[in-house]
Amino acid sequence: MNPNLRKILEKQHYKIVGSHSGVKACHWLKEKLIHNRCCYKEKFYGIKSHRCLQLTPTINQCTQNCLYCWRYQDFTEQELESFDEPEFVLEKSIDAQRLLISGFKGDERCDKKMFEEACNPNQVAISLSGEPTIYPKLAEFIEVCHKKNMTTFVVSNGTQPEMIENLKPTQMYITVAAPNKEIYEKLCAPMIKNSWEKINESLDILSSLNTRTVVRHTLVDKWNIGLENSGEGSSPSRQISSKFVDEYAELDMKAEPDFIECKAYMFVGYSRQRMNLENMPSHEKIKGFAEKLSDLTGYEVAGEKKDSRVVVLAKDKRKMKI
């Protein structure tokens, strides 16, 4: 790993694992330990925020340079020339998580039982940074997690369909951050050829996977949800492009996911060098978008979490909890 990149990541409180992986304690893990406030994944799907291990097997490898990404992108690589074994990545990631949260043990606000549980995670969020499907042994890594009775969420940008069709996580996400190819190429800045076509192929594959599936729309105001000429002070629903919602609905129906997450871009990290605060949609606008998408897809609005600016739609909300 580039030593300058390592310094940047460590300053951001990442723990580097091996040669290409990383762990960072999630904001909501800390909130659960100190204030007993959970993330939207616990509220919607039932996983425990304080027992979630947030990691990436590709800390600096990606196929896109999305403008809204919080990642430092100057050292981005598109492949892994050599890679660590899945057992090593998981074991060292758990060790890293324990180090990251060790300071909470002496905090009188932290529940002791909850802290001990946090030191033994039972859920792995394979996202955080980079594109996880670049890791050639991702399928094996998921199997290693499951053998240890850990649930797995994989968040992918969908540009590697040949990998996605072989994955069996507990819950498989494809992020669709644009309604069409033109906006996708401007907003997501793909670094490989035919990326939009590959995402569409992944959406086709998603409908056939024998696991829980999610399409996530990361929504960026003035880019992939709002209209530049909507008018100052107009209502959130009037600031949403019906054409865009129609196009998103078409993509969603291709994938037939169990759930659709409509989530606001958050003005954090290095995205602040590429975006403005006004690009972060209000929760009201996200909710308006989700309601329009619900009307078009037939999916039910099944939950929302205002402080995360996210709304989830479900094909069958009785099946939301894992």
What is the predicted role of each segment?
Residues 50, 119-121, 305-309:
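Short Gly/Ser/Thr- and Asp/Glu-enriched loop/turn motifs at secondary-structure junctions
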Residues 1-43, 207-210, 223-322:
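Auxiliary Fe-S-binding modules of radical SAM enzymes
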Residues 109-232, 236-276, 281-284:
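Conserved AdoMet/S-adenosylmethionine-binding subsite of the radical SAM
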Residues 93, 97, 101, 145, ...:
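Hydrophobic, Leu/Ile/Phe/Ala-enriched alpha-helical segments that form helix-helix packing faces
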Residues 23, 53, 124, 213, ...:
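A broad, low-specificity signal marking well-ordered, structured residues that form hydrophobic/aromatic
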Residues 88-118:
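Short Fe-S-cluster ligation motifs
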